[in-house]
């Protein structure tokens, strides 16, 4: 099976496709730098030459060794990784980490295994972890599909978050979307019975795509009649607030693993 991969660093808006013109600061890194984070040929993340701040680099150097978990092809002992037994939630593609840090701070009784490839975003979340003294967040800087496939045991998770993934809005790029039948089946296999998968997007056509794909997965059931109200634990992003004021929509989908 082939899976597309997870979202690029900027969440909440469509990203430019790889073949579109981009500003110099956002141009794709020459060569194939994504190969460091994924062995798969179809990926939905594209590494950009983003600017790394001094603070982000410092926390990559100082904080990531404390909270980072290297990718490996071996099951991860999740309780050992966090030093306790607690519900484990995977967050796929956390952007710059603001939402992740807020959720983790609000839910200290849960542990969050977060996955992102973008260096400045990883550095930003590391900074927020250090500033907030968040003991319940760990980071894997790698392709989310490979992390779930190779490191997460079956029925081990209490939840999975996929917030504002790249919609890859051009039809020829739909194969790069992270929400695909095979990947949803993989996620479902990692959820414990009764655990949830929560997706959110501000791209209406992608919301419809997500709803169709999730509804077709036999191991999952919708918790709502179509789209779900935004759960209280998911804070509004700055981009989302601006969009709502302009009348733009945001769609949440919350599905539960059948027993």
UniProtKB/Swiss-Prot annotation:
Region Disordered: start-end pairs: 1-36
Pfam families, A to Z: Methyltransf_4 (PF02390)
Biased composition (Low complexity): 14-29
SUPFAM superfamilies: S-adenosyl-L-methionine-dependent methyltransferases
EC numbers for this chain: 2.1.1.33
Gene3D superfamilies associated with the record: Vaccinia Virus protein VP39
Record GO terms (molecular function): tRNA (guanine(46)-N7)-methyltransferase activity
Catalytic activity: guanosine(46) in tRNA + S-adenosyl-L-methionine = N(7)-methylguanosine(46) in tRNA + S-adenosyl-L-homocysteine
HAMAP family, A to Z: tRNA_methyltr_TrmB
Protein name: tRNA (guanine-N(7)-)-methyltransferase
Source organism phylogeny: Bacteria, Pseudomonadati, Pseudomonadota, Betaproteobacteria, Rhodocyclales
